[in-house]
């Protein structure tokens, strides 16, 4: 089932023209598969649905969690030093580091629906640092030096994530092992090799990446018969909602105020000249919600695809795109001793990519995400229930068919990711 998570706005859809994405000769990334090269974007915006949204696999597992509808105080605070809009991993981490650096400053997190029910609660749980694949695109946009820094930041972020989970013994189904990038046709394999070699020639670290260019060996390693090459390096999978909940509980203990089911509708300059009580500085903003308004000094926008709904200046710069993630229960051919032992990035033509996350050490199901070859079609059917089509056929190619295969397919819904000019907005 495909379920659009963006409600139709009160006003007619806003059409935005003249927004382009940077072109690139190295199309190996998810964000480029939704529109290659320069294009005019026509999009609409909207607030999160108040009802009728799908319940993702991650959210199904935490229905008894008291954070779901948590409100730290019965009434919405009238003022705060900082208001964070959105309680996904971005908003939750911002609150964490805010309290670590400024423990005396007040923080209020407002969430339109239940806690962590947006993109973080709907993704595939694949924590995969880009080690080389984005180099061609970033080099063209920002130059070689900055491209290297972007990729190093991905690695640093992943290492910090794993270290935090292990240090604090976070119950979030963490698995660490090799992830496989697998080009599935000769053209994509050639492009992947070119980008990889350019990255290495520029001084990129590749000692930890195991490259296999022989198609027969790649097919053996990956168990994908059409594989033309394989690139392997360490990555992770996890249950993202559980991780976010752990961090938010730490935040609450540190004094963060969480207000769920409190959609922000607009942010306006603060109009009163009254100084912030006891702070010696003026408020700068007012966050307007369905439950009242909060005066504050700073606002952090962590609402992903929904941001343009309440911040009109960003309409066209951040655009919502529907994405779909599926849960599959593996048949016997991919269960037990024959279960998939790696996560995957299956690279297809035109930048399409399947992200495959086998839940090692958890319930053993396999999560499929990414940006499939039918992504443009998904844009068209995002407002109605649709069958699997090409996605189902690809699943059959991997897992086989028969009664067991048909019985064990499970769709678990979709969500909306926010895309900026060539980069995903967290």
What are these regions (language model features)?
Residues 99-122:
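Glycine-rich FAD pyrophosphate-binding loop
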Residues 124-145:
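N-terminal glycine-rich dinucleotide-binding loop that anchors FAD/FMN and/or NAD(P) in oxidoreductases
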Residues 86-92, 112:
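Glycine-rich Rossmann-fold phosphate-binding loop(s) that bind the pyrophosphate
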Residues 112, 167-175, 293-425:
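Active-site substrate-recognition segment that forms the wall
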Residues 138-250:
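Rossmann-like flavin
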Residues 198-202, 224-297:
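Helical element adjacent to the flavin cofactor pocket in flavoenzyme catalytic cores
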Residues 86, 130, 289, 296, ...:
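Short, well-ordered coil/turn residues at beta-beta hairpins
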Residues 2-82, 100-101, 105-106:
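Extreme N-terminal leader/targeting segments of oxidoreductases
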């Amino acid at each position: 089932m495909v379920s659009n998570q963006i409600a139709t706005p009160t006003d007619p859809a806003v059409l935005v023209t003249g927004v382009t994405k940077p072109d690139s000769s190295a199309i190996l990334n998810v964000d480029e598969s939704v529109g290659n090269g320069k294009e005019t974007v026509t999009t609409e915006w909207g607030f999160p649905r108040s009802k009728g949204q799908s319940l993702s696999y991650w959210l199904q597992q935490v229905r008894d969690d008291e954070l779901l509808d948590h409100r730290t105080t019965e009434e919405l605070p009238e003022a705060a030093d900082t208001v964070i809009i959105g309680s996904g991993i971005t908003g939750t981490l911002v609150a964490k580091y805010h309290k670590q650096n400024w423990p005396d400053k007040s923080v209020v997190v407002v969430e339109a629906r239940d806690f962590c029910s947006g993109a973080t609660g709907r993704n595939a749980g694949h924590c995969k640092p880009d080690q080389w694949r984005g180099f061609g695109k970033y080099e063209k946009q920002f130059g070689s030096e900055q491209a290297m820094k972007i990729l190093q930041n991905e690695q640093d972020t992943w290492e910090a994530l794993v270290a935090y989970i292990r240090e604090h013994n976070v119950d979030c189904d963490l698995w660490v092992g090799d992830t496989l990038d697998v080009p599935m046709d000769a053209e994509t394999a050639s492009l992947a090799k070119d980008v990889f070699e350019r990255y290495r020639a520029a001084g990129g670290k590749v000692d930890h990446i195991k490259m296999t260019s022989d198609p027969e060996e790649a097919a053996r390693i990956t168990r994908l018969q059409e594989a033309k090459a394989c690139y392997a390096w360490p990555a992770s999978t996890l249950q993202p909602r559980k991780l976010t909940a752990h961090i938010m509980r730490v935040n609450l203990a540190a004094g963060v105020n969480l207000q769920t089911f409190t959609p922000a509708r607009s942010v306006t300059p603060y109009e009163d000249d009254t100084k912030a009580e006891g702070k010696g500085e003026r408020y700068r903003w007012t966050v307007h919600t369905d439950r009242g308004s909060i005066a504050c000094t700073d606002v952090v926008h962590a609402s992903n695809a929904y941001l343009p709904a309440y911040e009109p200046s960003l309409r066209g710069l951040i655009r919502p795109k529907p994405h779909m993630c599926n849960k599959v229960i593996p048949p016997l051919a991919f269960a037990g001793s024959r279960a998939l032992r790696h996560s995957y990035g299956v690279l297809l033509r035109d930048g399409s990519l399947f992200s495959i996350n086998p839940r090692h050490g958890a319930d053993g199901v396999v999560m499929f995400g990414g940006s499939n070859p039918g992504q443009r079609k998904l844009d068209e059917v995002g407002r109605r229930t649709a069958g699997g089509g090409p996605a189902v056929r690809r699943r059959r190619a991997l897992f086989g068919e028969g009664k067991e295969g048909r019985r064990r397919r499970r769709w678990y819904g979709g969500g909306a990711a926010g895309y900026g000019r060539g980069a995903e907005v967290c």
